[in-house]
Amino acid sequence: QLTFTPGWGY
């Protein structure tokens, strides 16, 4: 789970 920017949820 990568969460760089508030909006990406991979």
From Swiss-Prot:
Modified positions (Pyrrolidone carboxylic acid) in chain numbering: 1
Q: List every position bearing Tyrosine amide.
A: 10
Q: Which InterPro entries match?
A: Adipokinetic_hormone_CS (IPR002047)
Record's subcellular location: Secreted
**Keywords from the UniProt entry:** Amidation, Hormone, Neuropeptide, Pyrrolidone carboxylic acid, Secreted
- Disulfide links within the chain: none
Which superkingdom, per the lineage?
A: Eukaryota
Listed GO biological process terms: neuropeptide signaling pathway
Molecular-function GO term, any one: hormone activity
Which GO terms of the cellular component aspect does the record hold?
Answer: extracellular region
The family note in this entry says: Belongs to the AKH/HRTH/RPCH family.
The entry's protein name is Hypertrehalosaemic factor
Query: Whose protein is this, by species?
Result: Tabanus atratus
